[in-house]
Amino acid sequence: EPESIGGTLERFGRVKLNRDPFSARAGEYVVTVTGSIGAVIPAQSTFKSDDTVINSGKLFILDSAYTLVATTDSITIRALEAGNDSKLNIGDTLTATAPIALVDSVVTTSAETIEPSAEENIEDYREKALDAYRLEPQGGAATDYRLWSADAQGVKQSYPYAKTGAVNEINLFVEATIADSTDVKGTPSALLLTDVEEVVEFDPDTTRPTYERGRRPLGVIVNFLPITVLNVDVVINGFVGLTVDIQNAIELALIDEINLVRPFVAACDILDEKNDILDSNKIISIILNTRPGSVFGAIVLNVGGVPYNSYTFINGNIPYVNSINFV
């Protein structure tokens, strides 16, 4: 359990992961400003995201003074609130909270230089700690790529596979945490993939000598790839005695169980925990476990828009429950 309730999770995590759970990370953004050449934007100037943007009313600060060298120039501002609640999109506008001489008060987001990240979920930290104890470093085997990927904030899991038909080439599929994904389904951003590449190349532990921090074996090519989310649609025919409460209970149970299905990597996963197949029998079992004695007709399962009786999730494919219908 976490130390906050008297447990020892973080203490054990520090031994293998060499860190506590990641704290939320504040985003940094390049914004376009207009004004007179030579105008100075003072350090600590503050900008507030406008009401028209998705995360409105958030404050951002300029850490160092900047002198405009062109009538249209750029500065880098940092969110005062860490996490995704202060995330900006390209094109979002902000307004200075106080007038700045010879500078337009409205600025426009043009780039994201540091991606914000949510605080690491304690269950994700627990899973990474367990993996760190269970998986032994092997100098470039599949287990190493999974362990190394866990050093990048925002990674929920990674799935390393040897690339078919290639020698010394790895496809490393990266799944983001829900909070840090681009679609709230697990798809990582390009910046997160870059972060994973950095920790696979080089150990982020700065207490170690530089010559000991290299990770990727010489001559090995690693392709850093996003997972692919496949929509899962389930149709349950002819359920007898269906009520709203029964329907809600079954839907929640199906969502919970289907979301646990993940690709199996033989080189670093435990065979007894293999859970990569979704089929009609599994859906029937979930329904009967949730509502014993249920009577219903045929189950129709679609994965990625294609009907299947059974589907095995491999490589970077993961499921997302798109719809559950009772007809």
Q: What are these model-predicted stretches?
A:
Residues 61, 137-276:
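Carbohydrate-recognition loop of C-type lectin domains
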Residues 1-9, 41, 57, 69, ...:
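Immediate N-terminus of the mature polypeptide
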Residues 71-135, 139:
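Catalytic P-loop NTP-binding/switch module of NTPases
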Residues 12-26, 103-127, 165, 225-229:
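Flexible hinge/switch segments at interdomain interfaces of large molecular machines
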